């Protein structure tokens, strides 16, 4: 049997479309409300947090490296996440108990590249851009 055709089939078409929408991954993600439940940021693009410790995450095969990351406890809800520290030597600008600004890391909530389970990256440290510290345009504020 094909789809219903002809007059007076609009209700059937509409309800079928409504049912089939739930099989679309993006529609489901947008309408189920899991953005607020499952996402540590709670639907926001960035979040501030306190650095708990520095960690090295081993890259997935076939690469062999230790990617420099930090464990961060978010201020808004207390959830703990692992955030990647981009660029060479930038881990030296971050100390424990620093306040950092964390953003998403590409791929809409999925891990990126060869770093397993890391979905976030550090953008600012102590309200100073990590890129500015790296390029030596700014210095860390004295604490």
UniProtKB/Swiss-Prot annotation:
Residues 1-26 are annotated as: Disordered. It comes from the Eukaryota. GO terms for cellular component: cytosolic small ribosomal subunit; rough endoplasmic reticulum. The keyword Electron transport does not apply. One of its GO terms (molecular function) is structural constituent of ribosome. The modification Hydroxyproline is found at residue 62. The keyword Flavoprotein does not apply. Residues 1-20 have a biased composition (Basic residues). GO terms for biological process: cytoplasmic translation. Its main location: cytoplasm. It is found in: Cytoplasm, Cytosol; Cytoplasm; Rough endoplasmic reticulum. Keywords: Cytoplasm, Endoplasmic reticulum, Hydroxylation, Ribonucleoprotein, Ribosomal protein. InterPro entries: NA-bd_OB-fold, Ribosomal_uS12, Ribosomal_uS12_euk/arc. Belongs to the universal ribosomal protein uS12 family. PANTHER family: 30S RIBOSOMAL PROTEIN S12 FAMILY MEMBER. NCBIfam families: uS12_E_A. Component of the 40S small ribosomal subunit. This is Small ribosomal subunit protein uS12. It comes from Dermacentor variabilis.
